[in-house]
């Protein structure tokens, strides 16, 4: 949220309408001007994947959240598409919302991801295999 706050303020100050889709909709009460923004409940994909003790990278997190389960993932993407149909965004900016980015891509809406090196990994090919860093003991 704090990552998007300055961007939101800049866009609003320059005449753009901004909407949020939040995992925890109660977060909206902490906004600088809470009545200035539309707020949607973000679709949340719960734990569905393999029982693992550690997620080493974002790909592991996606598996845990059900990204290998096509029908389940499709439901989450369709929920995002419903939000996009209602709001009609010109662009989608996501802070760790891979299903929203997938829905935006399918719908033809430009999207951007912001975040840290975990949710937006560096553009290196191949990515470092973090499983190799695990202590074998």
Regions found by a protein language model. Name each.
Residues 13-14, 18-71:
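Conserved nucleotide-sugar phosphate-binding/catalytic loop shared by glycosyltransferases and other
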Residues 22-24, 94, 115:
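Short beta-strand/turn micro-motifs composed of small residues
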Residues 10, 102-103:
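Hydrophobic/aromatic ligand-binding patch that stacks against planar heteroaromatic rings
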Residues 1-12:
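Short amphipathic alpha-helix
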Residues 55-99:
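Conserved nucleotide-sugar donor-binding subdomain of glycosyltransferases
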Residues 110-137:
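Active-site-proximal region of nucleotide-activated glycan assembly enzymes
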